[in-house]
């Protein structure tokens, strides 16, 4: 069963999804990859309270010192990329190419920055899995499912730009 809740962020509304114990999605309302949730049930779950506390701290410009339970769903490759995203520290960035090189070292297989970009773009848990911290090799802000204006805001909030 899918459960939902809503969070009012400084960037607009966000929908949270959960399997009942962990966060499975965090989407800006209206973002391009927003899932169809007609079968979802609204419920007050402990994980939603934790995520909202985390987001309150984050949007106050503070680095939260705890991590709510996360359970994104994706391919093995996507999951490996998302695991790397979770290691990017607050206030820092990396590039798609750097993630590809990291995966090449781990797997001993060739990886392209474009493949990494595809996985980053399918991240179902915005902000907590910080895909906004991935930038182009030339330092440019590249795609973000919530929109480049939101990516820029998040990077400014973290003191990156």
Describe the role of every protein-language-model region:
Residues 104-118:
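Short, positively charged loop/turn segments that connect secondary-structure elements
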Residues 1-107, 158-161:
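Basic nucleic-acid-binding alpha-helical/helix-turn surface characteristic of O6-alkylguanine DNA
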Residues 77-81, 112, 150:
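N-terminal positioning helix adjacent to the helix-turn-helix/winged-helix DNA-binding module
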């Amino acid at each position: 069963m899918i459960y939902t809740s809503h969070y009012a962020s400084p960037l607009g509304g966000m929908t949270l999804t959960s399997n009942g114990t962990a966060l499975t999605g965090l989407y800006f309302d209206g973002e391009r990859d927003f899932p169809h949730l007609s079968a979802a049930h609204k419920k007050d779950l402990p994980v939603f309270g934790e995520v909202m506390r985390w987001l309150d701290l984050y949007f106050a410009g503070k680095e939260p010192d705890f991590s709510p339970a996360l359970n994104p769903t994706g391919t093995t490759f996507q999951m490996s990329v998302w695991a790397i995203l979770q290691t990017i520290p607050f206030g820092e960035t990396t590039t798609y190419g750097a993630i590809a090189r990291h995966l090449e070292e781990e797997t001993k297989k060739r990886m392209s920055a474009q493949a990494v970009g595809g996985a980053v773009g399918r991240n179902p848990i915005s902000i907590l899995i910080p895909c906004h911290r991935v930038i182009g090799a030339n330092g440019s802000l590249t795609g973000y499912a919530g929109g480049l204006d939101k990516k820029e805001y998040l990077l400014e909030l973290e003191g990156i730009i």
